[in-house]
Amino acid sequence: MNTQQRAMEGDLSRIVAISRKEKDAVSRNDKVDDTLNGYKELFKGNDDKAIQARKNNYTHMVNTFYDLATDFYEFGWGQSFHFATRHKYESFEASIARHEMYMAHQLGLFPGMKVIDIGCGVGGPMRTIARFSGANVVGLNNNEYQIQRGKRLNESAGLSHLCSFIKADFMHVPVEDNTYDCAYQIEATCHAPDLVGLYKEVFRIVKPGGLFGGYEWIMTNKFNPEDPVEVNIKKQIELGNGLPDLVKPAEIINAAKAAGFEVITAFDVAETSELPWYLPLSSGVSITGFLHTGVGRYLTGKFTQLLEIVKLAPAGSYNTNVWLQNAATFLVQGGEKQIFSPMFFLLCRKPSTD
């Protein structure tokens, strides 16, 4: 069996998992439509009151989002739920791995180090970074479904000795002060209700002199809050990705400083990419890449609809797929207008006590 055949086999197994409701999917049930509608209620407005409501309910909001989206993400994107810069002639999979290894390189990871991945998803980046660096990586996640899925993937990859999980809210990590040598997050802390509060918690658990790196989702400085078209793109990105409120680069930097970190570097990595970061959402030539295209997403939707009709999928799976397709459309629009980026890179240091 060649690589493409193995990839296709894995993809087909995951589209069945979209709806088979694996036994460890704690918060899942057959009322997918009700869950999706309840999630959408949190995004009825975009004024300060509505944004605050999303922040107040962020744990429920984010868990609901990932209960709905995880299997679709893994089927159409892979085990690493993030974007990446991309060079000409570089495959999508290679760009994703390089993006993760760049983080490990910037943090200076090596065997024996103890590192925490803030908001680790099903652990794709964690496994890449553990393989690349030899460091012990602990994945922090508050979604039980993703953790159970990630544990199986760790075991399958032969990395259970280097990769593990903690189930907890990243605003309240149940570990002692100065526990980890380094910390990182890849497109995860955009879900935080209070960025300063989150960064303070990361500051607390990292050892003095330790580094914290992250890829943040931002509205770039080109975003015009007075332009209704751009405001709608922002709102739709937030709705489609379980976010309380997207901010500009200065707020990211100021939050890190307010938490006590020394900011080493901060820049939008997307500006260094030879190919647009959103290219996988609009084109692709591999089997996996095809699933990212408009045609691929359409066919995925039709197959999901068929599963509903023959009762292999609960009602609402098709609507969930349509909702995620819509989210992809607005991510592309934000990228094309250069008003949104999912990879504002921030590297900070916790001051040494010396």
Curated annotation (Swiss-Prot):
The keyword Amino-acid biosynthesis does not apply. It comes from the Eukaryota. GO terms for molecular function: sterol 24-C-methyltransferase activity. Keywords: Lipid biosynthesis, Lipid metabolism, Methyltransferase, S-adenosyl-L-methionine, Steroid biosynthesis, Steroid metabolism, Sterol biosynthesis, Sterol metabolism, Transferase. GO terms for biological process: hyperosmotic response; methylation; response to bacterium; sterol biosynthetic process. Belongs to the class I-like SAM-binding methyltransferase superfamily. Erg6/SMT family. This is Probable cycloartenol-C-24-methyltransferase 1. The lineage of its organism: Eukaryota, Amoebozoa, Evosea, Eumycetozoa, Dictyostelia.
